[in-house]
Amino acid sequence: MKKRLAVLLVIVLTITFSFSVTTRIKDIAFFRGARDNQLFGIGLVVGLNGTGDSGNVNSPLLLEMMKKFGVQVSENDLKSKNTALVMVLADIPPFAKEGMRIDCVVASIADAKSLAGGYLLQTPLYGADGKVYAVAQGSVIIGGEDVKLSSNLQKRYRVVGYLLEGAIVERDIPSDMLDGDSVTILLRQPDITTAARVARAINEKFEMDLAKAIDPSAIKLTVPSAFQDDLITFLSLVEEIEVQPDVPARIVVNERTGTVLFGGDVKLSDFVISYGNFTISVTGGKIGDKDATISNLVSALKAAGATPQDIIAILQVIYESGYITGELIIM
């Protein structure tokens, strides 16, 4: 027997964002020049209990990388199962100074079975310009060893580890936010409306035309003469200004986890669709006696017991037919 249901989406987990909130500018944007920089290098982890490299890996690419990074390892070292070649990665934050410590990640680049219990020998970390900005050394910490979901998951975690504050900054990375008498605010999620709102909020706060949105991702901000010698104080005031970001109408479906996330002003046009044992209808902007909202459709689908596969198929058909106003993303 067919069930007449007004349904759209529900899966194992459904997350809804249908309300507007205000947030600080610092939570949705950053100043150009104040960003992380990536560092990388190749090092050697020692002290492994027979879980290191087998010595059978003879990749020309790997040998070339070792030569480029100045890694001098003997043939015997490569054959020892107590050592492992690793890639060392780190993000150095803006304004990091010489002597500060940063975290880093190590990952096996050969055929080691596990880095647990290993110790990373002194490894220089390079920036994109080829200069050394930090040096890493220390005990490798392995996360996820107690995860029992699958043997494959455990293996994957054992060949990736991290060093908590394991790298020392050796060279400052230049971070210049000021361009003449102005700075640029960059939105983490570019949006025309949000950019305009940020500029308007700043101008209202200081009661002068200081900010102007130049594109969906950037707002140019002129530093007032009163703050020319106190840029940090001015920027701290700007960061604390609250704005209401514009949220696009969007539905995101993750097929693997059965998660549906929807936000913004997602609307439904009138339609009738028959799918399997379901007949779905929206008439006059109503689902029965309720408004044709995503939340009401979700509730109906939960009660109906539709499978994630049903939901994804229905969403695709409705979206491709033009009855959903917004963007559908299936991951």
Swiss-Prot record:
GO MF: structural molecule activity
Keyword GTP-binding belongs to the record: no
Example GO biological process: bacterial-type flagellum-dependent cell motility
Signal peptide residue numbers: 1-23
InterPro entries in the cross-refs: Flag_FlgI
A GO cellular component entry from the record: outer membrane-bounded periplasmic space
A Pfam family that the UniProt record links to this protein: FlgI
Ranges in coiled-coil conformation: none
Coarse class of the protein's main subcellular location: periplasm
Keyword tags: Bacterial flagellum, Periplasm, Signal
Subcellular location: Periplasm; Bacterial flagellum basal body
Subunit structure comment from the entry: The basal body constitutes a major portion of the flagellar organelle and consists of four rings (L,P,S, and M) mounted on a central rod.
PANTHER family: FLAGELLAR P-RING PERIPLASMIC PROTEIN FLGI, FLAGELLAR P-RING PROTEIN
General function of this protein: Assembles around the rod to form the L-ring and probably protects the motor/basal body from shearing forces during rotation.
Xref: NCBIfam families: PRK05303.1
Protein name stated in the entry: Flagellar P-ring protein
Protein species of origin: Thermotoga maritima (strain ATCC 43589 / DSM 3109 / JCM 10099 / NBRC 100826 / MSB8)
Source taxonomy: Bacteria, Thermotogati, Thermotogota, Thermotogae, Thermotogales
Gene symbol of the encoding locus: flgI
